Amino acid sequence: MTTFGTIEQAMAEIVAGRPVVVVDDANRENEGDLIFAAELATPELVAFMVRYTSGYICAPLTEDECDRLDLPPMHHTNQDRRGTAYTVTVDAREGVSTGISAADRAHTIRLLADPRTGPADLARPGHVVPLRARQGGVLRRPGHTEAAIDLTRLAGLRPAGVLCELVNDDGTMMRVPDLERFCAEHSLVLITIADLVAYRRRTEKQVELVAEARMPTRHGVFRAFGYRSDYDSAEHVALVMGDLGDGRDVLVRVHSECLTGDVLGSLRCDCGPQLNAALDQVAREGRGVVLYVRGHEGRGIGLLHKLQAYQLQDTGRDTVDANLDLGLPADARDYGTGAQILYDLGVRSMRLLTNNPAKRAGLEGYGLTVAGRVELPVRPHPENVRYLRTKRDRMGHLLEFDEVIEAPMGRAVVGDGIGA
């Protein structure tokens, strides 16, 4: 059985200028990164990192620092599967030779962590890859980028880190057994992002319960809990039915806001029927949560961008390519705020009402246990069958439905509404 160190031990190592090894969830990258504080970078630390990792050394910085240092994204559309926010690469403008040596990269990294550094002090491109960490850290995105920022901040240092993925001698990624052996050999502390999430949950609160009220609906009587997040301007609502008790085995639907489908009854998607089906299932069971996450319109691209994507779909593009054509991600949602709200409500393990496996992985990374997936039935309509096929075939949604005749592009088809 793997023995992991504590977050307190990791912070002590970071302050002492030593690296730690951080492993993420097995359902995410399932990789271990060597991480240390950027302001304490030395040629020896960088050389050690180069020797035992892929060598693609990155320097996580906060969003504010990336903006201050004029570090734009490496590409206008982030197509990285995990949403890692690479910026343009840099070298120190002065004090380096080619920029690639351990001493040169250590100098550049220290410069990135120095509050006196300005945009003109950096040359672009270079040999160090800054990463833009999500505001809110691992509570918003449980990635190594955010872990590096959280560890340095919690250790009382500048919130700027250095990281790279550990690899075996044959070039394959180190997994937990390999990481254990590596840490034992080099006397390094091994921690998990899940433990860092749990530590921050114990010591910080990122969401605020603003209001609670009785909410009678045509599905039954719920309690409505209104939340606001420190790192999210949107307001979110959780509809809770019954006593959640110990928070185990709770039926949960995390529903992304969709004005067109949920409110206007649009037939272009299946969002409205999914919301109604989830409320019905929770009401039948008499215990559960339907969490309505604001700010997720159009899988996170916003209402007007979604309408622009619809324009492209009317010319033949599918829902994925339409987003990409606009320079936007196929799916820009994160579930960090939603996970914090569920945790604040007392949910610890859940049966998740979803057809989207990525949603399960997105929630499990925040310390919540998904005990099982409950399928939401799908009834296709001529107006949304192409959308459903794309979700199934290109986005990995687990959908089974009877085929129907697709509506002509850009023309409305009169029909009965979509059922649940």
From Swiss-Prot:
Disulfide bonds: none annotated. The record marks 127, 165 as: Essential for DHBP synthase activity. Gene3D superfamilies: DHBP synthase, GTP cyclohydrolase II. Pathway: Cofactor biosynthesis; riboflavin biosynthesis; 2-hydroxy-3-oxobutyl phosphate from D-ribulose 5-phosphate: step 1/1; Cofactor biosynthesis; riboflavin biosynthesis; 5-amino-6-(D-ribitylamino)uracil from GTP: step 1/4. The active site is at 331 (proton acceptor), 333 (nucleophile). One of its GO terms (molecular function) is zinc ion binding. Mg(2+) 2 binds at residues 29, 144. GTP binds at residues 253-257, 274, 297-299, 319, 354, 359. D-ribulose 5-phosphate binds at residues 28-29, 33, 141-145, 165. Keywords: GTP-binding, Hydrolase, Lyase, Magnesium, Manganese, Metal-binding, Multifunctional enzyme, Nucleotide-binding, Riboflavin biosynthesis, Zinc. Its EC number is 4.1.99.12, 3.5.4.25. It comes from the Bacteria. Residues 203-420 are annotated as: GTP cyclohydrolase II. PANTHER family: 3,4-DIHYDROXY-2-BUTANONE 4-PHOSPHATE SYNTHASE, GTP CYCLOHYDROLASE II-RELATED. This is Riboflavin biosynthesis protein RibBA. It comes from Salinispora arenicola (strain CNS-205). The lineage of its organism: Bacteria, Bacillati, Actinomycetota, Actinomycetes, Micromonosporales.
